[in-house]
């Protein structure tokens, strides 16, 4: 039916919002030190446990999860490009095995001090900037500008470079485990 376009515009936004929600639910894993990797729709009890906590005779929580998740996640992530927004503490819970065909892009954030010109890692802005990147990537997938199943590294880096405040994006060569460090320079 013909209309003024106002309702159609609203419907389009609603469809985009639903598409974004679907992508968020399907593509996002959150790492919990207590429960391991969980989906956003998983119901879990409120808790406080750090991955660095050491359990008597067993090592750190992160090392316990690392052993438990190594094979499972390596199989599940096989053939995929993973944008890893975890902090170092949670990053220790899973790393791809050597020879894995999963490509893991570990996202870091650095800021240049205008007075000295020196770069430093900024944990204060890292979580915020990683959140902006997650939102931008999910919108790109929901909008059809980025493939979810076989994401192209160059396209992911372009999305990162387009974030407000990002002045430069750097990537290291892949290591033997299929990991590369991507640094967003603010």
Each language-model region and where it sits:
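Internal, well-folded beta-alpha domain core
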Residues: 4, 12-186
